[in-house]
Amino acid sequence: MTFDLKTEEGLLSYLTKHLSLDVAPNGVKRLSGGFVNVTWRVGLNAPYHGHTSIILKHAQPHLSSDIDFKIGVERSAYEYQALKIVSANSSLLGSSDIRVSVPEGLHYDVVNNALIMQDVGTMKTLLDYVTAKPPISAEIASLVGSQIGAFIARLHNLGRENKDKDDFKFFSGNIVGRTTADQLYQTIIPNAAKYGIDDPILPIVVKELVEEVMNSEETLIMADLWSGNILLQFDENSTELTRIWLVDWELCKYGPPSLDMGYFLGDCFLVARFQDQLVGTSMRQAYLKSYARNVKEPINYAKATAGIGAHLVMWTDFMKWGNDEEREEFVKKGVEAFHEANEDNRNGEITSILVKEASRT
């Protein structure tokens, strides 16, 4: 039986009649934001798997802002499995000094494209904090970078060590995760063209990036590791960072670790250039140092540089930070990163930064 989970009436019918949940009066609230899902917060009179407040995500087959950008609804199955895998391996991914968590996955309904998970509470994203005036302190930014770096390195270790196990092999089938990355890479050439950049390396790089993301089985990657998917939880005095939540695991798949590197570090470069140089730089340096200390395989600096370049070209225009001239300058920096990666130039601007900062272990 299917329900219209885009409406409150349909949602209530689904929760009460299909799942037999005791929903609190006025307990349903639609959450804003999100590119591809209709998301609800639901308060309950009686606990569901130990929780009296839950989040329900209803997958849509296209971007909220662009119905022509198609994205398969089966992605929710991969998010649910990712949450289960990370939770089951929390002792390997973290330790007493790691504050990174994911919400608990509670239920997945393939018929209604519904994913129910733990409600971790209302909090701001890392993106909110780095764009605030004033932004978070450099000390907090450094802590975030260090924590995320350690967690992602251990995720990459875990993926490499378990790729032959069925519950990990499952992620190789995330075609949505692969094709979404392909669609994003296809924006590189037109994004560069907006700023009058027509470099013969662009189609070569796009082809290489697409081929790799469509075929790589190197390790398990989060694949959407940017500041909008990182929630920061502080203590009641708003002074101590107590927990970092990584959310939106729909694109989790087997693929190149450079994709995770490119997303997070590319975000750090954007923040440093357009928001706060010290915050962005501190976060980047801490991430690289922590990632290098925890990862068991050598970092491929050329691929990481290409991933950062892709992020800069794909997202500089989208974020609309700075003026046209400043954005053009930064898109050019992304294109130059492609040349660095293609030549494996350790003395290039971005590559030299990566090598230097990752070696500070």
UniProtKB/Swiss-Prot annotation:
GO biological process terms on file:
psilocybin biosynthetic process
Catalytic residues (positions): 224
Keywords assigned by UniProt, alphabetized: ATP-binding, Kinase, Magnesium, Nucleotide-binding, Transferase
Please state the biotechnological applications recorded for this protein: The pharmaceutical interesting psilocybin as a treatment option against depression and anxiety is being investigated in advanced clinical trials.
Quote the EC number: 2.7.1.-, 2.7.1.222
User: Listed GO molecular functions?
Assistant: 4-hydroxytryptamine kinase activity; ATP binding
Q: Which cofactors is this protein said to need?
A: Mg(2+)
Q: Give the catalytic activity.
A: 4-hydroxytryptamine + ATP = norbaeocystin + ADP + H(+); psilocin + ATP = psilocybin + ADP + H(+); 4-hydroxy-N,N,N-trimethyltryptamine + ATP = aeruginascin + ADP + H(+)
Q: In which pathway does it act?
A: Secondary metabolite biosynthesis
Which EC class is the enzyme in? transferase
Give me the residues that bind ATP, please.
Answer: 37, 57, 118-120, 248-250
- Explain the purpose of this protein: 4-hydroxytryptamine kinase; part of the gene cluster that mediates the biosynthesis of psilocybin, a psychotropic tryptamine-derived natural product. The first step in the pathway is the decarboxylation of L-tryptophan to tryptamine by the decarboxylase psiD. PsiD does not decarboxylate phenylalanine, tyrosine, or 5-hydroxy- L -tryptophan (5-HTP). 4-hydroxy-L-tryptophan is accepted as substrate by psiD as well. The cytochrome P450 monooxygenase psiH then converts tryptamine to 4-hydroxytryptamine.
| Subunit record text | Monomer.
The family classification in the record reads: Belongs to the methylthioribose kinase family.
Name of the protein described by the UniProt record? 4-hydroxytryptamine kinase
Which organism is the protein's source? Psilocybe cyanescens
What gene name is given for the protein in this entry?
psiK
